[in-house]
UniProtKB/Swiss-Prot annotation:
Primary location group: mitochondrion
Residue range covered by the transit peptide: 1-32
Assigned EC number: 2.3.1.1
Organism from which the protein derives: Kluyveromyces lactis (strain ATCC 8585 / CBS 2359 / DSM 70799 / NBRC 1267 / NRRL Y-1140 / WM37) (Yeast)
Gene name as annotated: ARG2
Protein name: Amino-acid acetyltransferase, mitochondrial
């Protein structure tokens, strides 16, 4: 401890210009992994010397990592600092021999020429329950290593924090600094997803998914625990199998409990931070990578996951093994793709999330919407005064600003009203999707008629991914949309589709028209409809002939 203070106090307090290695790191990563928009956002945010940005790194299972592993991770901490964030390392209250592990971590940081200081009791609990956080952040290049203790004035005694999520949220809510990132390092990696064959969820929108995930893990845990307890009416073979699998059952239970704690940590911590803050869970091996697909470094630069969460499941495996996908960074390091070492498979990104409203009115009326044009005004007498109404004024506004054209709302509603499949609204109309029923009366299909995201939020918060995920879950078997042939987003659309058709093609029986659109369709590629020429002809004909509703 004395050596740590000597190192910190003898460090000159001044601004450190990035060295050649630092500049090279920033430029190489910017050139290889991010879009122009992301590069601009990163440079605007993290190269301003007057604004200080911090990231919390919560280390679980610290005692289980070898010195070689910790040495590799210390290099990532150095990269985080070089990229403009000030890391604050926090030791898990459940860690064995906290003092020794903190000193061990401190030594590895020092070996990387990093300056760190161990903070023994960062939180003081007053006699009346007040919380005071004291964190000696001496200069941009001194890294605090926080031990999970709280000093209680009433008892005049230092206690180990019991609940990691409460400790972290108390710490964060009382720190007067800008915390942009919350990184959690766990030997188990991100939260497991059934849809991804127990590989990690790519992205979690907590306001939408927290409760569902918590209940799912709780149900799985109860099933595992019931297997251990229920020995009644088991024959000798079943009892023997249970005995032989006991260690595996206990291991799975421990892992599930850890994932539930990680989910709680992210939910409580991000709930007291701004909406712009991002959480991320990964393994220490993934977080130690020196290649471009280090999920911590990548998220600092892009504020997103290594791969898009809205990629269809049948494309994710291909994307994980191919570097040609738009969302995947290139890497000079060729590695065998396995769940143990592939960053994509062990990383989950979190956002506090934004409100989502889904309106499933087939027909819009004055009872369920606001701003209905006079030509469409009707009342059913079935109004629910509690239910939220669709605001057509705001809906029209985001469509106009996103498409940079003026929608003829009366003409548009005249076409879709009575055939609405669903309308999805994100936040305060910061993202929307309008889905309609199109096609033959006896066999209609769902068509994404309008999709818009506010200009200020394009490429951020994962809004596009959230909308597409919602649509894919709601209409998993058949979903169609079209896009202009010169639309720069078409590559993104292609990755989320099962197939693409040019709408200028000859549909047979002399049915051919010039069209500026491509048709994209989504669903199970093994489904009969996607191998049925007549069904594909229906898609093309009805989507091609939809009349636009823009003011001229």
């Amino acid at each position: 401890m004395i050596k740590t203070w000597i190192r910190c106090l003898t460090t000159e307090v001044r601004y450190h210009q990035p060295n050649a290695h630092g500049r090279s790191l920033v430029m190489s990563v910017l050139n290889s992994t991010v879009t122009k928009r992301e590069a601009k956002d990163y440079l605007n945010k993290y190269t301003d010397e007057n604004n200080h940005h911090y990231c919390l790194v919560f280390l679980r299972h610290l005692s289980e990592y070898s010195d070689n592993v910790l040495s590799g991770f210390s290099k990532t901490v150095s990269r985080i600092q070089t990229l403009g964030l000030r890391p604050i390392l926090i030791v898990d209250p459940l860690c064995q021999d906290i003092s020794y592990q903190s000193q061990r971590l401190d030594n590895h940081l020092h070996d990387q020429s990093l300056k760190s200081i161990i903070v023994l009791d960062p939180i003081t609990i007053g006699e009346r329950g007040s919380i005071d956080v004291k964190l000696p952040i001496l200069n941009p290049h001194i890294i605090p290593i926080i031990e999970p203790y709280q000093y209680h004035e009433k008892e005049a005694f230092k206690k180990l924090a019991g609940d990691p999520s409460r400790f972290l949220s108390s710490l964060v809510s009382n720190l007067p600094i800008n915390i942009d990132k919350v990184f959690l390092i766990s030997k188990y990696g991100g939260l497991p997803s059934v849809e991804r064959h127990t590989n990690s969820h790519v992205f979690v929108n907590l306001s939408q998914e927290y409760r569902e995930l918590r209940n799912s893990y709780q149900n799985q845990l109860e099933k595992l625990e019931s297997i251990q307890v229920d020995n009644t009416e088991k024959n000798l073979v079943e009892s023997l199998q249970l005995f032989l699998n006991q260690d595996k059952i206990l291991s799975n239970s421990d892992q599930l409990k850890c994932h539930m704690e990680d989910l709680e940590i992210m939910n409580k911590t991000l709930s007291v931070l701004p909406h712009s803050s991002t959480g991320l869970i990964t393994t220490i091996l993934a977080g130690s990578k020196l290649s471009d697909n280090n999920p911590l470094v990548y998220n600092i630069l892009t504020d997103r996951s290594l791969i898009s969460s809205s990629l269809p499941r049948f494309k994710r495996s291909a994307a994980a093994q191919s570097k040609s996908w738009y969302e995947l960074p290139s890497s000079n390091v060729e590695e065998e793709v396995t769940s143990a070492n592939d960053s994509v498979l062990v990383t989950t990104v979190f956002k506090k999330g934004i409100d989502i409203h889904i309106f499933d009115f087939r027909t819009l009326t004055d009872d369920n919407s606001i701003g209905l044009p006079p030509s469409q005004a009707t009342q059913t007498g079935k109004s629910d005064p509690v239910s939220k109404k669709l605001d057509l004024n705001k809906l029209n506004g985001i469509i106009n600003s996103s498409f940079k054209r003026s929608l003829d709302l009366s003409h548009y509603l005249g076409r879709i009203n009575g055939n609405i499949a669903s309308i999805i609204v994100i936040g305060d109309y910061e993202g929307i999707a309008i889905l309609t029923y199109e096609g033959p009366k006896d066999k209609q299909f769902v068509y994404l008629d309008k999709f818009a995201v506010a200009q200020k939020l394009k490429g951020s918060l994962g809004i596009s991914d959230i909308i597409f995920n919602l649509m894919f879950r709601k209409f998993p078997h058949e979903l169609i949309w079209r896009s202009r042939e010169d639309n720069v987003v078409n590559k993104w659309y292609f990755q989320r589709s099962t197939g693409v058709l040019h709408l200028s093609l000859d549909l047979g029986n002399d049915d051919q028209k010039q069209s500026i659109f491509k048709l994209f369709y989504y669903g199970n590629p093994e489904s009969e409809s996607f191998h049925n020429v007549e069904r594909l002809r229906d898609y093309a004909k009805y989507v091609r002939d939809i009349t636009p509703s823009w003011h001229k």
